[in-house]
């Protein structure tokens, strides 16, 4: 039985979510006396990180193959890291989850939205984030941030047009989700950081009262 709090951070490449999580990981190890574990997808545990490395190498794989590899990584990640943490009443904060698969593999790479959603249902077995925070960013700002990276991979969205398509897909999928909050990630990084930490802190405190 899940006891902890599962929080997912989503957003287009260049939204600042990964930088946010690196900073939060350094500054917050617990909230309201609840320990926090941080993770990412694909990855998060030994087997899942190995699958991540494989995904990064396979730039020309079929979109459904890629979606299945993400599912394999996610299954191991949930079993080995996320679910044990939640069962120990910890806060699990993850960089990306199933919504990323729906959008990137299902819609953008045309593996089929319903197909990708269905195969992920087998893996997640009904588990949903208690809170999803979408870092919504102006495509021009995201594209600039990506261009300034020292390294990039084939999963990164390079053009403003592609970023905008992904952004719109995120907004469409999450706009009516009562467990999702959309924040303006085009603001300066310190403002975004303070805002999101406050959202997470208040959510965890209110979650304990319910």
UniProtKB/Swiss-Prot annotation:
It catalyses: dTMP + ATP = dTDP + ADP. One of its GO terms (cellular component) is cytosol. Signal peptide: none annotated. GO terms for molecular function: ATP binding; dTMP kinase activity. Transmembrane segments: none annotated. HAMAP family: Thymidylate_kinase. Belongs to the thymidylate kinase family. Phosphorylation of dTMP to form dTDP in both de novo and salvage pathways of dTTP synthesis. NCBIfam families: DTMP_kinase. This is Thymidylate kinase. The gene is tmk.
